[in-house]
Amino acid sequence: IKLKKGRLEAEPVDSGINEMLASYGVSYQNSLVVDQYNFNTAFNMGNGMVMNMPYPFWVKVFKKNMDAGNPALDMIDNLLFPWTGSLRVEEENLGEKKASVLMSSSDSSWIQTSWDLNPRQRFMPQQSELRPHPLAVLVSGRFTSFYKAKEIPQKPVDNSSAVSSAPVPPQNETIVDGTEDAALLVISDALFITEDFARR
């Protein structure tokens, strides 16, 4: 998602890679995870008043919702996933690959499709909507390239340069059809690893 500066609103962003990810067995869902187990944060309420309150969009991932069999998670007790979407394992695209959910929200979480991030809105999910949602998925095994039998995509234009330039056609490049043994880690949130959130 893209946060709107100075406002508690967001808008969805198309990463351009979801079709490729889905072909490998995992896709990103363009919605927000809301969780009854969350982190507190302070909000400016106006007139110089600051209020500290629970914020359901700041999902708290507990140890029990992490893959106990993955040694990379051994030393982690909990994590903050702010304004996160969710992932879905695309079973029909896995083939012989294996997908493991490394982290998920609690069983008291649900999906919100609106982009209003106001902490004072009424959060009233139906009981039937509450369930865990995958936040990190590891896909491993033999991968067939998404670009197999396709034209090599052109490199994007660098719009930061003052000199305009056209897309650069690929030169002396080939596409690897696949790999026998690889791993792909997909995480639903890009902010959780940044300093401000990782140290909470």
Over which residues does each language-model region extend?
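Acidic, S/T/G-rich, low-cysteine, solvent-exposed domains in lumenal/extracellular/periplasmic regions
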Residues: I1-R200
